[in-house]
Amino acid sequence: MPERELWPAGPGLEPATRVGSCDSMMSTTSTRSGSSDSSYDFLSAEEKECLLFLEETIGSLDTEADSGLSTEKSEQATTPQVPRALPKTQPAPQGHPEEITGRVPEPKRVTPFSSAHPPGPQSLGLRSGSYSLPRNIHIGRNQNLRKSTTLTNSHNPGGSEGLVSGPETEQVSQSREPRQTLATPPDAALELDGALIPPPEAFRDTQPQQRGQGSLPRGPGELSPRPQVHPSLSSQRNREPAPEAMSQKASEKGSTGEPVPPRPPPLVSSRDAGSGDAAVLSGGHPSARPAPLTAPKPRKLPPNIVLKSSRSSFHSDPQNRLSRHSEAAPGDPSPASSSLQEQRKARREALEKLGLPQDQEEPSPRLSRPSVRLKETGVQAVSPAPAQVPGRAPAAAPTQGPSPGKAPALAQPPSPGKVLVPAQESTPGTAPAAKSTPIPIPKGPRAHSPLTQRKPDSGLTLQESGVPGLRQMSFKSNTLERSGIGLSSYLSAEKASSPQTSTSLEKGSFLDRISPSVLRNSRPRPASLGTGKDFEGIQVGKLADLEQEGGPKRLSFQGQSRDKLPRPPCVSVRISPKGVSDEHRREALKKLGLLKE
């Protein structure tokens, strides 16, 4: 073959001549001519034999793929598909910047790193003439690729475009693999080349179809911005299936004529062909399988997951949750009712764990009270639709509820609050909206308590009421502060309740004068520790005797125990100053309005 005898003037310069850049051809001739002849001297006899054998195999493959079409025709047919080269993608390694601009088969720059042709780059890695050897072999394979695509072009002009663009996508996925072969010996690299020739099933079946489908709407000029990095391995893979079969697959894909979005950027930096294959199959073409990939993503969470959130988030944003459920409710009433039952059960368990009042465990009789009240007071509102009456029941609850998130609604007078909130909540106005009424349950049971209407900002005033003894008997708690009987919450509750429970105006100043120790002695106890009535008999019996007997000894031991010996948490002790009898305490409680007889 003439290519074997004249390498510098052989196929290495034909693409440059056909593209029409004479400057790059002349520069290549001038730079390569001096060193390419002497580049054989650095090769051993085995390497030369390997190169000649590679050329013969390439020539035989060219004749097989040609099948009657000459090289000139194939070049003229395929060069319009890749008309413009990319000067930006790859830098010139040896300082020849003008060579890159004119040549279409860009991969000649990357050829020294190719695993298919290692002998030249290994022995002559630093010489500029070393690029000629693998470059020519590379061009032979590139020509083979072009001939196969022109054969398919005669059958199906639209499908051959996809076959040309197919190797380009594959080149990038394998561009990093050849750089590992710089350190391998030539024989091992040749064995690797032989091992890479048979393509996997995924490349043989799905890849040409997907690429032919992906490149159908593109014009020939749009293929130019794709960086051609390494076509040697891809040309080996695309050489295996028959061109007729590939063109038939491409024509089948082209006959569908689906509009496909443009291909994703081809920067699949996979090390081996298998992982690059998987990356292109899984993430590269979303248009191939649109339905299973995109369908599960916008799936919403089921309503019970949203409902089983913490108590603080429930209080902070009850309005959003109610509107969310009233949106989901009109479509399917039965899941709404089941989710409400699950919500009640979850709230009941959470309240038991937190030690909060358990009168919230029976929300339905509690909630029916304000709704009955509204039915009595707002008789004129019953006529439009019966579904609006349950819609107003949760509307009255936020206006009276003590939730911190409801502070702006509570700052308004009650009548505009009742007007504003139904405007938001009664808009569904259907019967399933009535099923979402028990959602603002934590605010409903407090509708009758006068303290919480006045003091919405303290979060612990939930548990306060006008009759503290009755209220605090109804729950068990692990700590004092969690159950809402902390000193600060007690003070704020007393200050808030003073205008209602007293007839004189000196009650507020009296509260300010009281020291915290007196308040600590007189405030109601949680149910787990018992109320004051439980300890009255003990006070008269054992503790009174201890006070009379102990005297100063007991006081000194008390001072020691406060500093050194911590009191066990399960024991509750009422500490009163010496000489203060129970009558004084009762009088103080009566003045405070806490003790009613």
Curated annotation (Swiss-Prot):
**GO CC term, one of those recorded:** cytoplasm
- Compositionally biased tracts (Basic and acidic residues): 96-109, 342-352
Q: Where is this region: Disordered?
A: 1-40, 63-477, 492-585
Q: Point out residues bearing the modification Phosphoserine.
A: S130, S132, S515
Protein name (Swiss-Prot/TrEMBL): Specifically androgen-regulated gene protein
| Pfam families the UniProt entry points to | SARG (PF15385)
What task does this protein carry out? Putative androgen-specific receptor.
InterPro entries from the xrefs? SARG
* Family recorded in the similarity comment: Belongs to the SARG family.
Which residue ranges have biased composition labelled Polar residues?
68-81, 141-157, 307-321, 492-506
User: Which organism is this protein's natural source?
Assistant: Bos taurus
Keywords of the record, alphabetical order, are: Cytoplasm, Phosphoprotein, Receptor
Task: Please indicate if the UniProt record lists Transferase as a keyword.
Answer: no
| Residue ranges, compositional bias (Low complexity) | 20-39, 328-339
Indicate where this protein is primarily found: cytoplasm
Where does the UniProt annotation locate this protein? Cytoplasm
Q: What is the lineage of its organism?
A: Eukaryota, Metazoa, Chordata, Craniata, Vertebrata
User: Taxonomically, which superkingdom?
Assistant: Eukaryota
